[in-house]
């Protein structure tokens, strides 16, 4: 980089600007600050259904997984509707 280009400033191409912006967006999403529903929640819900189905007959809609975030606190809420057991 020459002294002249340093003083005047280099004109960045739109491709490099777009690349930098995408990198910032990806880093932001990977940090988890912007994700309201992480990628692992659907897989977690499927695995819970598979394990519980070994013991009790339930439908996919009977399991609800919800993640709530506030500041530095994360709460994972899992609601499972089990069928009535007749004795």
Curated annotation (Swiss-Prot):
Highest taxon listed in the record's lineage: Bacteria
InterPro entries named in the record: MinE, MinE_sf
Q: Does the keyword Cell membrane apply?
A: no
The Gene Ontology biological process annotation of the record reads: cell division; regulation of division septum assembly
Q: Which UniProt keywords apply?
A: Cell cycle, Cell division
Answer yes or no on keyword Transport: no
Cited function: Prevents the cell division inhibition by proteins MinC and MinD at internal division sites while permitting inhibition at polar sites. This ensures cell division at the proper site by restricting the formation of a division septum at the midpoint of the long axis of the cell.
Q: Which NCBIfam families match?
A: minE, PRK00296.1, PRK13989.1
Family assignment from sequence similarity: Belongs to the MinE family.
Q: What is this protein called?
A: Cell division topological specificity factor
